[in-house]
Amino acid sequence: MNPNVALVSINNLTVRYGAFTALDDFSCQIEEGCTGLLGPNGAGKTTLLKTLLGFITPTSGGGNVLGLDLYNGNKEIRQKIGLMPEQDCHIPGLTAVGFVAYAGELAGMPADQALRRAHEVLEYCGLGEARYRNVETYSTGMKQRIKLAQAMIHGPKLLLLDEPTNGLDPKGREEMLDLIKDISHNKGVNVLISSHLLPDIERVCDRVVVVLRGKLVSQGTIRDLKRIEGQPLDVDLRESNESFLASLRAKGAQAAPTTYTTVRVQVAGTREHAMNTILQSAKESGAQVRGVKLAERSLEEAFLTAVQA
């Protein structure tokens, strides 16, 4: 995969339902890999997914999906994308293998190929032993897995997953996230996950697009989003040392403990100058430095900063 290739390019997209604006002059780039579409409920995430699939016609703006125009390539776009919707989508009376095979046929696969592939994706999703059961007898976790299986049946270039861990218990959630991570990192399938759950996004995604009230508020790698302005350093000490803090402050550095043995340090100037200041203060105070790394905020802190800006 090339992480600099845009799979989806959205330009100044606006979607209105009557007087309500669901997407407001929205622009973003979705690159190869696994991207999280992050925002609170009602932010416009599902509207964006439906627009990408051609289920909703934008009020204004445009873009392309997998090189196809958003307005003129709807059918081709849907053939290249797999959708795992938030709501259940199974057909009553069908077995799991029958339902997934039918989804393959709807995507244009020959019946025999769709049936063979249905067995494969159900096995991959952990439903091999239950594939002949009617889907309505499935638990919530199993229904989530079959939604993923039907989205994968036709070998799409891009998977759209809408709240894929919705309703799952902790074990089921971990297993679903493991599946998604394997699909993205080992199977080479591009994934766009819509979620309001920050831990899910951080667990499996490389990049994130943050949406609030229909507007783009931030996009980039998770590492970029977590980066702290000014790039302070976290110094890990063997034990707490007040003299170390005093020495740093005497040299003009900003220094504050974040845990009992960790000090966050910010020094004006180059990174080399900052390291020299830290090492000199450690020597003067007798502090034992176990490690130094770039300080990061949590994804939750980064998200709250973005949406409150």
Predicted regions and their residues:
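Conserved catalytic motifs of ABC-family nucleotide-binding domains
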Residues: 155
